[in-house]
């Protein structure tokens, strides 16, 4: 397995190569094949640490950094002399403390979107010469955002939200546009974001008080009509939206008392999600099965209040403590890392822990580059020696056969 993780303490990253069964907390267990520092350029500083990773066409590794830098690295093979060579560094005009909330690929445009907390959004066309000037998309409203997502079914559609900024869906450009648009002289005119949906808040609580809004994550789900979305909040809620049914959430569930940090689909059917919070929760929930009386709270005025929640399918346990910020589900595995400085890799279906590696740094982002086990150098040398011995044996047999023939 090969995973790259951000190193928040230094502003660089680490490449971890390990196999199933790796556990650095046990002296007699399998140890990582390698843990190498990388992405040291353009500068290694906590003030420009990497917040998001993206693999672009399996050709480039892109990192969105605090303060507006977007670094593009070469995704080279293991035998390359210089791994993750810096190819280009875009510098976006944002404040030094402005944090990227999303780094997304727009396949139909051969481009990426970078969204910041300040509500600034940039479109960058990725070509071989990296000579495209980032285009700032002027949003209809400028409110701070905490979440930004693209619709995989229609990449001209995005959704955003944040603190007291309820869910909005926007159209960034016409659906018929593709990457040839950048050949036009005034291509900027093709990108005029428009709000096409504004959500309404849930009804007041049992005390008739307004429920506060603070969206932390957004996922687009598959939809035959309109748009379906899943959101998480700073108040531990999971909400399901269907624009074909109205502006309010179709379902509103409380799954934790802590702020939800990440939200990830756990299967291709999009019927399961993985949630992490600021404490130690890493859990898988069903979106189709509901426990009607799973969440209980006591109110001085209303007594015991019972609410339904998505069925808990199980937790990913491996001694994790503190918030988990880096999450990536890929093929059969899922990887986690965060404040406790450990990388943990699990089987996505069974939740069995496959690898546990101490990193020595806090992590904001990670990306699985390969989910298969990797041979270490000793194994490679042994196999090469066996192949050479086999070849020598066949050569000897071939020589004897020719001698007998003569």
Curated annotation (Swiss-Prot):
One of its GO terms (biological process) is ribosomal large subunit biogenesis. GO terms for cellular component: nucleolus; preribosome, large subunit precursor. Gene3D superfamilies: YVTN repeat-like/Quinoprotein amine dehydrogenase (2.130.10.10). InterPro entries: WD40/YVTN_repeat-like_dom_sf, WD40_repeat_dom_sf, WDR74/Nsa1. Its main location: nucleus. It comes from the Eukaryota. Residues 373-406 are annotated as: Disordered. Keywords: Nucleus, Ribosome biogenesis, rRNA processing. It is found in: Nucleus, Nucleolus. Component of the pre-66S ribosomal particle. Involved in the biogenesis of the 60S ribosomal subunit. Belongs to the NSA1 family. This is Ribosome biogenesis protein NSA1.
